[in-house]
Amino acid sequence: MRYNYNDGSLKIDLDEELDMKACKTLRTVIDGYIMRYQPREFIIDLSDVKFMDSSGIGLLIGRYNLIKFMDSKMIVLNPTHSIK
């Protein structure tokens, strides 16, 4: 995972697998970035994600709900064919 914050926009680049084990850690880390930066725009790039189970979907929905509560917007970029 990589992240970048610039001018109100927080971008998270996720990689490899979004399974239960990975999501447990990612949830804490990503929420920390969201609370720290309070972005107006939150971008998650999935271009390097090869596998996503229901935990990954839950991760995305949970971050969406948090961002929506903050009156910000969330953008999901580049979902690969295998996870669409």
Where are these regions (language model features)?
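Amphipathic alpha-helical interaction surfaces in cytosolic regulatory modules
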Residues: 20-84
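STAS-typified acidic loop motif
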Residues: 1-28
